[in-house]
Amino acid sequence: MKASQFFISTLKEAPADAEIVSHKLMMRAGMIKKLGAGIYNYMPIGLRVIRKVENIVREEMNRAGAVELSMPVIQPAELWQETGRWDKMGPELLRLKDRHERDFAVQPTSEEVVTDIARSEIRSYKQLPVNFYQIQTKFRDERRPRFGIMRGREFTMKDAYSFDRDTDGLRKSYENMYDAYVRIFRRFGLEFRAVAADNGAIGGSGSHEFHVIADTGEDAIVYCPTSDYAANMEAAEALPLLASRAAPAEDLVKTATPEKAKCEHVAEFLGIPLQRTVKSIVLAKDTEAGAEIWLLLIRGDHELNEVKASKVPGLADFRFATENEIVDAFGSPPGYLGPIGAKKPVKVVADRTVANMSDFVCGANYRDYHYTGVNWGRDLPEPVVADLRNVVAGDASPDGQGTLEICRGIEVGHVFMLGTRYSESMNATFLDENGKTQPMQMGCYGIGVTRILGAAIEQNFDERGIIWPAAIAPFAVVICPVGYDRSEAVKAEADRIHAELLAAGVDVILDDRGERPGVMFADWELIGVPHRVVVGDRGLKEGKVEYQGRRDAQATAVSVADVVGHVRSQLAN
C-alpha cells in the first residue's frame, strides 16, 4: 500500500478533553474521531488495528472449536425480563421503543439471546457440547464516559457462550476457553496476567479476568511472584495478620478523644500504632420490616472490600447507612462508632484480623470518646468473622508460597462459569440418555476488542508516540523515501523494496506523500509502526539504506541488496 492511497490525519496536540495516554495518542495518530460522548468513529488506521485483533481472536476461537454466529444488537425486552436483568441492570442498559410501543434493549451482552437460541435449537445431549461466539457491537450507557475507548459507551466485543450437559463438561469448556485466551494474549504480544475474579452482575460460580499490565491501569492486580497465585483486588483473599489472639492486658477505659473522628487522628492523639485501632463501617440492608443495620469492623489501616462485604450471608445488595440511620442506631454521629453499647440491635461482623486483636481501640458511641483496651469475650460477645478487607502488599499469599505484591492492570477479557443461572430462568433444557430433562450448564467468555487497542497503547508508548506490538500494528513496515518526488534513484529503490516486501507477504506501506523527512518520521513514530526503512540519495551513493526498529535508539545502515532479508529477519524476531 502507498500512503497516497490511504488516509493519514495526525495532530500535533491532543484535544483538551483527552485525559489518559491512550486517548491522547489515538486522537493524535488519527485512529479515532469523537462523534459524541463515549462514541467514536474508527478511522482507517484504527480500523486496521481492530481487524488484526479480530483476526487473531477469530483464529484462536475457531481453533478452540467455537462456532461463529451473529446476534442482533437490538434485543426484545421479553428475553431480558425472563432473567430479571431488565429491571436489575438499571440505566446502563439502553432501552427504546419501536413504533408499536414494544420495548427493546441495545445489547451490552447477549446471554439472553444466545440462551434463547440454545433452548430453541438444542433438544438432546447428543447436540452438546457447543460453543457459540460473535464479534459484535455493544452499548452500555455509561454515566460518565471517559478515557476515550477505554470507557466508551459503544464498543466491539467478542463474546462466546458454551453449553454443556454437566458441570464436568462446563469445567472442560471453561479450561478450553481459558487456554484459548492465553494463546490470544500471547499472540497480541502483550504482558498480561490471568487473575481469579468475582462474577459480578453476570452471575455464576467462578471466573477469571485477563489484565494487560500497565502502570496507568485502573485495576489493582494481586499476585505472588513465587507461585501461580493471582487475583484481582475484589477476589484476593486476605489472611488474618495475627495468628492468634493475645490475652487481655488492659482494662476497658472510655477515653476522651476530642474532635478525633478518624483512626489516624485517634492513634496520633493516643500515641499508639494505627494498627491498634478498629474502624467501624455501618451498612444497611433493606427488608420488608425496615432497614437492618450492620456494623463491619476492620483494622484502622485497612480498607473495606465491598465485594467481600456483599458475600457475607444476609448482606447481598447492601447499601451504606445514612447519617440519620447511624445516629438512630448508635446514638452517635459517624467517627465515634463501635460495637459496645449501640442503642438498637446491630449485627456485628469482624474482619479476620480484627477478630484476633486484643486491647484495641474503637469508638464509644459517644461524640469525642473512644474505648481503649477493648477485648472480645470480656467486653463484648465473640463476633461473626469474615474476610472483609483489601489485601496489601506484603500480606501472606493464600497458597502459603510467599508474600503478595500488587501491580496495576487493565481488564480486557473475562471468563465466567455461569452454571444454570440463565438456563434455569429461561428453561433451556435438553434430554439426557434416560430421557430426563436437564438444564444446560453455561459458560460465558468475553474479550473487549476495541479496549485491547487502548490497553496495548497504555503498555507500549514513549514520548514520540505509540509502540505497537508487531502482531497488531496497523502496518508492520513503513518505507520513508527522502525525496521520492524529486529523485529517480530514491523512487526506484523505494518502489523495489516495497514490491519485494509485498511479494513476501509483509504488511508494508510506502510513504509517497512527498513530505519532509521530519514530518514523515514524526507521523510514523506517532502512529507506532514497528519497523522503518529510510531510502535517501546520500545512502544510495554508498549502496545503503537505513533500518530502524520503533524501540531502537539508532538507525542501522543496511546494504541495498540485503535490506529485504534484514527486514524479514527482524519481523521474524
Swiss-Prot record:
<comment type="subunit">
    <text>Homodimer.</text>
</comment>
<keyword id="KW-0648">Protein biosynthesis</keyword>
<dbReference type="InterPro" id="IPR004154">
    <property type="entry name" value="Anticodon-bd"/>
</dbReference>
<comment type="function">
    <text>Catalyzes the attachment of proline to tRNA(Pro) in a two-step reaction: proline is first activated by ATP to form Pro-AMP and then transferred to the acceptor end of tRNA(Pro). As ProRS can inadvertently accommodate and process non-cognate amino acids such as alanine and cysteine, to avoid such errors it has two additional distinct editing activities against alanine. One activity is designated as 'pretransfer' editing and involves the tRNA(Pro)-independent hydrolysis of activated Ala-AMP.</text>
</comment>
<dbReference type="Pfam" id="PF04073">
    <property type="entry name" value="tRNA_edit"/>
</dbReference>
<dbReference type="InterPro" id="IPR036621">
    <property type="entry name" value="Anticodon-bd_dom_sf"/>
</dbReference>
<dbReference type="InterPro" id="IPR036754">
    <property type="entry name" value="YbaK/aa-tRNA-synt-asso_dom_sf"/>
</dbReference>
<dbReference type="GO" id="GO:0002161">
    <property type="term" value="F:aminoacyl-tRNA deacylase activity"/>
</dbReference>
<dbReference type="InterPro" id="IPR002314">
    <property type="entry name" value="aa-tRNA-synt_IIb"/>
</dbReference>
<keyword id="KW-0067">ATP-binding</keyword>
<keyword id="KW-0030">Aminoacyl-tRNA synthetase</keyword>
<dbReference type="InterPro" id="IPR023717">
    <property type="entry name" value="Pro-tRNA-Synthase_IIa_type1"/>
</dbReference>
<dbReference type="InterPro" id="IPR002316">
    <property type="entry name" value="Pro-tRNA-ligase_IIa"/>
</dbReference>
<dbReference type="InterPro" id="IPR033730">
    <property type="entry name" value="ProRS_core_prok"/>
</dbReference>
<comment type="similarity">
    <text>Belongs to the class-II aminoacyl-tRNA synthetase family. ProS type 1 subfamily.</text>
</comment>
<dbReference type="GO" id="GO:0005829">
    <property type="term" value="C:cytosol"/>
</dbReference>
<dbReference type="InterPro" id="IPR004500">
    <property type="entry name" value="Pro-tRNA-synth_IIa_bac-type"/>
</dbReference>
<dbReference type="InterPro" id="IPR006195">
    <property type="entry name" value="aa-tRNA-synth_II"/>
</dbReference>
<keyword id="KW-0547">Nucleotide-binding</keyword>
<keyword id="KW-0436">Ligase</keyword>
<dbReference type="Pfam" id="PF00587">
    <property type="entry name" value="tRNA-synt_2b"/>
</dbReference>
<dbReference type="InterPro" id="IPR007214">
    <property type="entry name" value="YbaK/aa-tRNA-synth-assoc-dom"/>
</dbReference>
<dbReference type="InterPro" id="IPR045864">
    <property type="entry name" value="aa-tRNA-synth_II/BPL/LPL"/>
</dbReference>
<dbReference type="GO" id="GO:0005524">
    <property type="term" value="F:ATP binding"/>
</dbReference>
<protein>
    <recommendedName>
        <fullName>Proline--tRNA ligase</fullName>
        <ecNumber>6.1.1.15</ecNumber>
    </recommendedName>
</protein>
<dbReference type="InterPro" id="IPR050062">
    <property type="entry name" value="Pro-tRNA_synthetase"/>
</dbReference>
<dbReference type="InterPro" id="IPR044140">
    <property type="entry name" value="ProRS_anticodon_short"/>
</dbReference>
<dbReference type="GO" id="GO:0006433">
    <property type="term" value="P:prolyl-tRNA aminoacylation"/>
</dbReference>
<dbReference type="GO" id="GO:0004827">
    <property type="term" value="F:proline-tRNA ligase activity"/>
</dbReference>
<keyword id="KW-0963">Cytoplasm</keyword>
<dbReference type="Pfam" id="PF03129">
    <property type="entry name" value="HGTP_anticodon"/>
</dbReference>
